[in-house]
Each structure stands twice: as C-alpha cells, then as structure tokens.
Amino acid sequence: VESITEIRKRFVAPAMSLGALSPEAHELLAVAMNRMGAASNSGEGGEGIERYKPKDNGDNANSTIKQIASARFGVTAEYLNSAAELQIKVAQGAKPGEGGQLPGFKVTAEIARLRHATEGVSLISPPPHHDIYSIEDLAQLIYDLKQINPSALVSVKLVAQSGIGTIASGVAKAMADKIVIAGHSGGTGASPWSSVKHAGIPWEMGLAEANQVLTLNRMRHRVTLQTDGGLKTGRDIVVAAMLGAEEYALGTAALVAMGCILVRQCHSNTCPVGITTQDPALRAKFEGTVDKVVNLFSFVAEEVREILASLGFTRLNDIIGRTDLLTQVSRGGEHLVDLDLNNILALADAGSHARYRTVIGRNEVPDTLDAQMLKDAHDALERGEKIQLAYTVKNTMRAIGTRLSSMMVRKLDTSQLQPDHITLRLRGSAGQSLAAFATRGIRFELLGDANDYVGKGLSGATVIVRPRPSSALI
C-alpha cells in the first residue's frame, strides 16, 4: 500500500495569511509542510524575503504556494518568483461572495511592511478582483502569472456552489493547472462568525459536480482537483478522493495540532494560545512545534493507508473519481430519509482518459515578446551593463516585460539597480498587461497606446506611455 510519505505529499495547509495567523504560527506551518514534502499556502498578505531561503538547520520556512487575492497585499515580483505554485483566490468557502478584512489592531509594523500598508489601519480586500470580471479576464491573469514565474503551476480557488462545473470548465480552458473547491466549513483564521455558521455549501456537492463536468468534457486529465473545508480524518480524505479530489487541505486540524483550543476569537486578536493574534504577550504563549503538525498529518495518512488496504487498493490514484465505491446509507433523523444523493454519486464516463491529472508539468501558454528581449539583453545583463532596446509592438503582444522581470528578480539584486538599467523603447499598440509585475531596473517608454492592465502589480519599474504626435486625441 502507498506509503505515508507519498500520501502526505498530497496534503496542503490552506491559505491562512500572516496577519490572520501570528508570525510564529505562520512560519511553523510552512516549515512543517515543507519537511513532509507537502505544501503550505501563504494566504493573502505577503511573506518576508528572509523566509525564501532555507535555514542553517535545513528547514525551509518558504510557503510553497503563494496566494493572489483581490487586494493584492504583498504581491510583488519577488513574492511571485519564490513560489512553486501561484493561487488565484476567487472566493473563500467560509464566506462566499465576501471580501476580507484584517482589523487595524492586527496590522502591526511588520505586517504593514509586508503588505505595503499603514500600521494600525484596517486592511480590506474587496469581494471581486478588479481585473477579473469575465472568464477571459481570469485567463489573462493566469497568463500574466505564468510569465512572471516561468516554472510555477497556477491554481484557482473556487467555492462550492450550484453550477460550479461550468465555472471549473472555464477555468481549465483558461489554462489553469489546478482547481480548488472550497466548502463551507473552516474559515477559522479571519472569517466573520455569521458567515462561518450560515454561508456556503458542503465541499462534497461542489467537488462532485466539478469532477463530473470536467470528466465529461474530457478535461479532467489536464487539471488537479483539490478540496478543503473541514477535512479532519483519513475517512474524509478517502471520501474526497472517491468524489474526485487528488489533493486535500486541512486548515483547522493543523491549527489544532499547533495548540488551538477552538475559543473562536480568531478575529479579535485575543487568541489565548498565540496562534491567531499579533499581541506580543499572547504570542509568547504559543507552544506549537513542527513535530506536532507532522504527527497529525502522519496519523491521517496512516488512516488513509488502512482504509485503502481494507478496500483492496494500493494507491490513492486507484480510487480517485470512483464514486461507484460510495453508497448512501439511511442514518440520522427523519428529515434525512428523503435525501437523494444520486447526483453526487453519479459516475461520469471518462472515456479513454484518466480520472486524475496525467499532464506532466504545467499547461504552458504562448511566449511573449520577452523571449526575444531575453536573447537581446542576455550579454549585457551577464556583464552588468546598462542596455537600451527598441521594438515595434502590436496589440497581440501581451505582458511585455513580465518574463524579463522574472529573470532579473532571479539573477540580480534589483534593489541596487538604477531605474534605467534596461530601457525598453516601444512603438505601436501594446497588448494587455504591459509591464505587469515589472521590477525596479526596467524603464518602459511606449510611444502609442496600450490595452488593459498597464502596470498591474508594478514592482518598481518606470512606465511612460505617450500618444503618437499624430494622434487625434491631442
């Protein structure tokens, strides 16, 4: 039967920001997940660059997954290039349709620095991303993220709801690599209590529909499905696998392993065990350890192994999407007698494709003008010399300068560069996302016009757009 080590690699610590969690809890969770070869999610709010490199003892506090949420707090070129996976948070299961809010009393000097905000001022994330109002806009953001980090997978976090199958299909067509289906449970770190109790639907309903529609549309093998929202036991993991999930996020359970006693004061900055507070006196009471978190996930993985063995299977892949292994039982009150779960338990026809992701690597997107820019600037950058490049652009050339920014962040200390280390003189109509996430050291001079999202996520670059002298606009 598949080993504990292999099963643990499918586990994820879901998005909980540095702000919702104390610095100690946030870092410990990342170290624990990295030690297991699993993944932790930074949540919305950035992460200190000192965590991007392994510690002297070999532990790694860098969150494998970096989240891009609606307010884009802490989202810089450096942040995006420190991840193996970039997650676009469209919504959160515990509070669907709502934004987020970090109260001012939680915004310490350190959190304000990471989020590029003001200490003591409440930070509000709007319900929508203001650059996503259609599936095409989402596809553009996925494209931009795959340019700023040429090696990272891109995931999209959705909320379980009726019709999610159609949405998931659109996300898959937009070239996402992973889709997260979030259920109504959870939301421990920073969700309003009224939403935690009354909003959302179970992950089982959303996961089953997303898996069925993706399978019927012959796209299931292109994407990974992950689910979260109250998963606690090995049985939960096995049921999620049978309903179609390949990865499993345990958030509240991980906090309990660190010492959470479920006082439900997460949003008030008064957590008595130092997990969801920024108060130094309360943070001093934090007693969580990496071993405790590793032990929890190890025991859950062991229970998964035992259930697999009892069913006669040797790998989790063998049961993914196998809803025929689930049966409805009558148990509980009279109000449950008429409950019909046939829609959830329907087995979709996968045809000749697998019921789980078989694509190796990520779903690649087309190159941009940057492929040529990197060739032209290579020698000068290797010598540390300034360079000026000129190009004629057209509106099909998207995310100009973004891949170049990625290369500079990875190879150079951009904080020490002159603003015009590389000058790009462009002429024509630039496509969407000109200078998206562009870093310090690049100067863009465009004579002409540009489409949407100019300077999205700008990380220090200079962008100058001037109309043509012959333009009728001036």
Task: Give the positions of each predicted feature.
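Terminal amphipathic helices with adjacent charged low-complexity linkers/tails
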Residues: 42-84, 89, 105-109, 157, ...
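Internal, non-catalytic "lid/hinge" segments that mediate substrate recognition, gating
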Residues: 114, 411-414
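Acidic/polar N-terminal loop/beta-strand segments that form early-domain functional surfaces
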Residues: 21, 43-45, 392-394, 427-429, ...
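Alpha/beta catalytic cores of nucleotide-metabolism and tRNA/nucleoside-modifying enzymes
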Residues: 1, 7, 17-24, 28, ...
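Active-site-facing alpha/beta catalytic cores
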Residues: 7, 18-144, 148-171
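Glycine-rich phosphate/ribose-binding loops and adjacent secondary-structure elements
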Residues: 50-51, 126-284, 397, 401-406, ...
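Structural beta-strand/beta-sheet cores of well-ordered domains, especially the beta-sheet scaffolds
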Residues: 9-17, 36-38, 64-66, 84-94, ...
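Flexible, charged surface loops at secondary-structure boundaries
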Residues: 79-82, 172, 382-385, 417-418, ...
